[in-house]
């Protein structure tokens, strides 16, 4: 009897698939139900952000950063602001640093809540997202009360932050922290010991530490494999060196470890937030929130009403913008998804010559083939969920 030629089966996963997290298209080659090859097709959300930033002044480029990882927008602005501040060689006052750290940690919790609960939803649990989004809604209100926008904040500006926070808002953030631990415990009790969740995540998508470094992973992807690498500790920026917090580290490098790390990181973020709130209501209650050099940071409205110089500064800042000394700088922050870096090249004019964005999700997505090979088709969505990918930053 003649042998029949067995051909592998090709299917498209996405870009309309609910588990594809945005506009991802995966071309999967299957042998029965075993994944032989994964080919991610990206670029469906490409907007040419890096090129557009070259035609804008340094201040006008800030809103582009919000639209990258739009789940935790302020963390991206943070890296850009740090890069511009290094080129300008200016310092942010202590109160401004604390506000930045506070809102960066709010962004981290926003991101991890979305990821952990949708990861549970990807494998069939429908309750966690409802609980998670309830907390995210409260945090979105804190975003809104700080800068007027729920998502695209443009709140971190080079030199500091846009406006000071009212005491009432800081108190409300402080009141939110303790009940949040209860919510986390409820989520923990619901998902962590769940038999089905464990079966879908334990020993799935295992990454050894040397592989993680070789693929250019950062953030949770590296910590899940056993390295305590966190830019907030290893290369501290702002006032992170004064904060007390721990870095959770995994042992097995699988999807389940990465989930556990994200859960613990939310607790650590809440700890950092508590320290920031105490300082902002205590020792650092009064003080400037941005650099006082009016050649870079616009003067206050009150000054503009009675000072001609202030009005001229304001006009120059919002028409021409400030000129940044020629040079190049790389600034990175520990964004919720990993190391988000901004490589900024200045030619001495009022617009960036080149701004390269290093998105953590980009490096993680390229390893999809390496991670999924040999797994079942159903595991693809579990692995994708644990990578924590948002397409704004992958395609930019």
Swiss-Prot record:
It comes from the Bacteria. Its EC number is 7.1.1.-. It catalyses: a quinone + NADH + 5 H(+)(in) = a quinol + NAD(+) + 4 H(+)(out). One of its GO terms (cellular component) is plasma membrane. Keywords: Cell inner membrane, Cell membrane, Membrane, NAD, Quinone, Translocase, Transport, Ubiquinone. It is a peripheral membrane protein. The keyword Cell membrane applies. It is found in: Cell inner membrane. The keyword Translocase applies. Belongs to the complex I 49 kDa subunit family. NDH-1 is composed of 14 different subunits. Subunits NuoB, C, D, E, F, and G constitute the peripheral sector of the complex. This is NADH-quinone oxidoreductase subunit D. It comes from Brucella suis biovar 1 (strain 1330). The gene is nuoD.
């Amino acid at each position: 009897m003649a042998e029949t030629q067995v051909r592998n089966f090709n299917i498209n996963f996405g870009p309309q698939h609910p588990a594809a997290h945005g506009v991802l298209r995966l071309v999967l080659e299957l042998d029965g139900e075993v994944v032989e090859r994964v080919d991610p097709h990206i670029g469906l959300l490409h907007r040419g952000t890096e090129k557009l930033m070259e035609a804008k002044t340094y201040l006008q480029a800030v809103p582009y950063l919000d639209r990258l990882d739009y789940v935790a927008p302020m963390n991206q602005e943070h890296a850009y602001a740090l890069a511009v501040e290094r080129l300008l060689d200016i310092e942010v006052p202590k109160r401004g640093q604390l506000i930045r750290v506070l809102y960066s940690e709010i962004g981290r919790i926003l991101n991890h809540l979305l990821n952990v609960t949708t990861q549970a939803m990807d494998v069939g649990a429908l309750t966690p997202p409802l609980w998670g989004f309830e907390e995210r809604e409260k945090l979105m209100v804190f975003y809104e009360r700080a800068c007027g926008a729920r998502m695209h904040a443009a709140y971190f500006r080079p030199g500091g932050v846009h406006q000071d926070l009212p005491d009432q808002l800081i108190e409300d953030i402080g009141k939110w922290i303790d009940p949040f631990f209860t919510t986390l415990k409820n989520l923990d009790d619901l998902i962590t010991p769940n038999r089905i969740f464990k079966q879908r995540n334990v020993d799935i998508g295992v990454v050894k530490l040397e592989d993680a470094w070789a693929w250019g992973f950062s953030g949770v992807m590296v910590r899940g494999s056993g390295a305590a690498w966190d830019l907030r500790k290893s290369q501290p920026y702002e006032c992170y060196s004064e904060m007390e917090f721990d870095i959770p580290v995994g042992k097995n490098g699988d999807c389940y470890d990465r989930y556990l790390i994200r859960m613990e990181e939310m607790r650590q973020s809440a700890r950092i937030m508590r320290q920031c709130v105490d300082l902002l209501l205590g020792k650092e209650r009064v003080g400037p929130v941005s650099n006082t050099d009016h050649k870079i940071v616009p003067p206050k409205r009150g000054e503009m009403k009675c000072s001609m110089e202030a009005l001229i500064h304001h006009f120059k800042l919002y028409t021409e913008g400030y000129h940044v000394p020629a040079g190049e700088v790389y600034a990175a922050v520990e964004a919720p998804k990993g190391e988000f870096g901004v490589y900024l090249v200045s030619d001495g004019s009022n617009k960036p010559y080149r701004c390269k964005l290093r998105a953590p999700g980009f490096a993680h997505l390229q390893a999809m083939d390496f991670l999924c090979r040999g797994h079942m088709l159903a595991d693809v969505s579990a692995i994708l969920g644990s990578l924590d990918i948002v397409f704004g930053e992958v395609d930019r």
